């Protein structure tokens, strides 16, 4: 009989069981950066919950109080889900993880639960599961981002996005990467940008986001933890291949300054 276990991680368990993403490359900079970030965020009550099937990692959910979230959303009093991932669909694993999050939020008297989705990238959770559980779409933002929310009562204020996305891009003329290690794949994404830039003889300004306030002020997308900007235009908010980056940058180099 299959044994299912939900394990709420802490620093000691992350050191032992390991975090979920990039676990096959535990010596990589991305994996080590993620674990360091997790240990810092555990002190701010971040929850990192893994689902084990017969002691094997098959899914996880990461969420935190919105006031400490890595998503550019105004949602004070809510829980914000960063990630939800399962290795197999149709087994109810996603529902179990989501229920864990919602139960925890209710027990802590939160206003509700919110999540950022985007159908055009796998870097955010799929919205299908949340719609199945009566989350409602409350806001949209450029680049196909959507904000889904499950409020616990009808009289609470709903979360919302900032509205100055375009203004956030205008100050960057040089090729610039804004990042934090909430996602371990940020390192690989960064390396691909650097490789493409090197082929074109471009220097890169790398900005490490150090705080929630800095994230809320500077990020040009709701995703928050990875943005590539050149000549006032967003190149990407997720990992691209070196060739894809090269083509995008080359197009901008050949166009008007």
Q: Where are these predicted regions, by residue range?
A:
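A short, internal acetyl-CoA/4′-phosphopantetheine-binding micro-motif in the GNAT/acyltransferase core
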Residues: 82-91, 119
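Conserved catalytic-core motifs of GNAT/GCN5-like acyltransferases
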Residues: 116-117, 134-148
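Conserved beta-strand in the GNAT
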Residues: 50, 56-67, 80, 85
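Local sequence-structure signature of Cys/Sec-based thiol-disulfide redox active-site neighborhoods
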Residues: 164-199
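Short amphipathic alpha-helix that is part of the acyltransferase structural core
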Residues: 1-53, 164, 183-185, 189-192
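Non-catalytic, surface beta->alpha helical segment in thiol-disulfide oxidoreductase systems
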Residues: 231-257
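Conserved acetyl-CoA-binding loop-helix of GNAT-fold acetyltransferases
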Residues: 91-106
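Conserved GNAT acetyl-CoA-binding A-motif
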Residues: 105-119
């Amino acid at each position: 009989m299959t044994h299912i276990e939900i394990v709420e991680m802490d620093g000691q368990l992350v050191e032992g069981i390991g975090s979920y993403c990039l676990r096959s490359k535990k010596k990589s900079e991305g994996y080590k950066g993620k674990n360091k970030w997790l240990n810092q965020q555990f002190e701010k009550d971040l929850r990192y919950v893994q689902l084990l099937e017969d002691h094997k990692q098959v899914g996880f959910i990461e969420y935190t109080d919105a006031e400490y979230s890595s998503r550019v959303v105004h949602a004070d009093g809510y829980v914000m889900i960063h990630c939800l991932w399962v290795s197999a669909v149709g087994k109810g694993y996603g529902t179990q993880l989501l229920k864990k999050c919602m139960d925890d939020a209710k027990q802590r008297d939160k206003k509700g639960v919110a999540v950022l989705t985007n159908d055009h990238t796998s870097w955010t959770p799929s919205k299908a599961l949340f719609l199945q559980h009566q989350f409602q779409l409350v806001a949209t933002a450029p680049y196909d981002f959507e904000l889904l929310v499950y409020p616990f009562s009808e009289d609470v204020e709903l979360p919302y996005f900032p509205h100055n996305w375009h203004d956030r891009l205008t100050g960057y003329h040089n090729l610039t990467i804004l990042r934090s290690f909430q996602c371990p794949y940020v390192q690989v994404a960064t390396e691909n940008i650097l490789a493409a830039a090197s082929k074109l003889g471009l220097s890169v300004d790398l900005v490490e986001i150090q705080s929630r306030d800095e994230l809320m002020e500077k990020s040009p997308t709701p995703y928050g933890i990875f943005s590539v900007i050149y000549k006032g235009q967003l190149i990407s908010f997720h990992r691209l291949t070196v060739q894809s980056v090269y083509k995008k940058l080359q197009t901008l180099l050949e166009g008007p300054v």
